From Swiss-Prot:
Quaternary structure note: Monomer.
Name of this chain's protein: Phosphoglycerate kinase
Compartments reported by the entry: Cytoplasm
Pathway(s) where this gene product acts: Carbohydrate degradation; glycolysis; pyruvate from D-glyceraldehyde 3-phosphate: step 2/5
Lineage: Bacteria, Pseudomonadati, Pseudomonadota, Gammaproteobacteria, Aeromonadales
Transmembrane segments: none
Entries under Pfam families matching the protein: PGK (PF00162)
First-listed, main subcellular location of the protein, grouped into a coarse class: cytoplasm
GO biological process, one term: gluconeogenesis
Protein's organism: Aeromonas salmonicida (strain A449)
Transferase recorded as keyword: yes
Family, per entry: Belongs to the phosphoglycerate kinase family.
Length: 387
């Protein structure tokens, strides 16, 4: 993917607008989880060090477009940035007709979703964003799959449009895993439903040497192999699809499972052979034999893509399968990339964040890239790089 990179540009004295992903949870005016801001700090610091007249914007929550709403203000993010950067940071509310910024100064432009035309990407709004800057930096991978005013339109009309370090790193890691994977390549896809991950499974079945399925998705494959899944979450209307995928791809078959009788934190866990599941059972995890077999596959891989846990890891008695998978990925010398909300929660729970080669910040954008879809904001940056 050939895009202009912010790291290659001279930003001294230039008006620079960064579209970041600062969509963080806020409670009582305080940021409660700062991961996305922390991920953006190196980009901000680099632009300030380069002497940019720096503006940054993001969405936060889902406000009614065209209306200011204090609940969705970026003010708590501004307060966080003041502390993190130990420098003054201004919040600009009305900025579409221009902002005065000094070299080495940072101004946060209020929630871009307060602007009418943001979601529809109206040309009028896109041109107003573009007029604010000499250089537009797209650094919000999590919104790259949306063609909105602050992600796509501004990149179309800004004098220069480039990828920030976060976005460039994300594209590089995904390209390494998906476009030119070192083999063998193993993909692990968990989640509750085949239907929501069908395109992902189909796309990965063409790339991966082995496709590991987990969670509710695995139940559909277990049923497709002719086993009883009891009361487990299972999409019986997709059994033929599962059979087709299993015939076309190397999908390891689950041999043992961990079952309970109801979806609750207190239901006792029982390990069973996959052929011994009864009508009253609910499958909530893979068993130890299956987990060990998958760990061996992971340890022999050269590239690993992980999207989704293999069991209900939130309940400790059904977390062993996901823990074994997580620890195998952590111990493997392979290049590994992980993405998706539940996957990140599992990485946190088992403390392996520093052992995964790359953790993707974009949920929907990550999945769309894996599905082989074009990400509009990235496509626009590529178009501008060619011009």
């Amino acid at each position: 993917m050939s895009v202009i990179k912010m790291t290659d540009l001279d930003l001294a004295g230039k008006r620079v607008l960064i579209r970041a992903d600062l969509n963080v949870p806020v409670k009582d005016g305080k940021v409660t989880s700062d991961a996305r801001i922390v991920a953006t700090l190196p980009t901000i610091k680099l632009a300030l060090e380069k002497g940019a007249k720096l503006m940054i914007t993001s969405h936060l929550g889902r406000p009614t477009e065209g209306e200011y709403n204090e609940e969705f203000s970026l003010a708590p993010v501004v307060n966080y940035l003041k502390d993190a950067l130990s420098c003054p940071v201004r919040l600009a509310k009305d900025y579409l007709d221009g902002v005065d910024v000094a070299a080495g100064e940072l101004v946060v432009l209020e929630n871009c979703r307060f602007n009418k035309g943001e979601k529809k990407n109206t040309e009028e709004l896109a041109k107003k964003y573009a007029a604010l800057c000499d250089v537009f930096v797209m650094d919000a991978f999590g919104t790259a799959h949306r063609a909105e005013g602050s992600t796509y339109g501004v990149a179309q009309f800004a004098p220069i449009a480039c990828a920030g370090p976060l976005l460039a790193g994300e594209l590089e890691a995904l390209g390494k895993a998906m476009l030119k994977p070192e083999r063998p390549m193993v993909a692990i896809v968990g989640g509750s439903k085949v239907s929501t991950k069908l395109t992902v499974l189909e796309s990965l079945s063409k790339i991966a040497d082995q496709l590991v399925v987990g969670g509710g998705i695995a139940n559909t494959f277990i049923a497709a192999a002719g086993h009883n899944v009891g009361k487990s979450l299972c999409e019986h209307d997709l059994l033929d699809t599962a059979k087709k995928l299993a015939a076309e791809t190397n999908i390891p078959v689950t041999t043992d499972v961990v079952v309970g009788t109801e979806f609750s934190e207190s239901t006792p866990a029982t390990i069973k052979s996959v052929s011994d599941v009864t009508d009253g059972d609910m499958i909530f995890d893979i068993g130890p034999d299956s987990a060990k077999a998958l760990a061996d596959i992971i340890m022999n891989a050269k590239t690993i893509l992980w999207n989704g846990p293999v069991g209900v890891f939130e309940f400790d008695q059904f977390s062993a399968g996901t823990k074994v998978i997580a620890e195998a990925i952590a111990a493997s010398p392979a290049f590994s990339i992980a993405g998706g909300g539940d996957t990140l929660a599992a990485i946190d729970k088992f403390g392996i964040a520093d052992k995964v080669s790359y953790i993707s910040t974009g949920g929907g954008a990550f999945l769309e890239f894996v599905e082989g879809k074009v990400l509009p904001a990235v496509a626009m940056l590529e178009q501008r790089a060619k011009a």
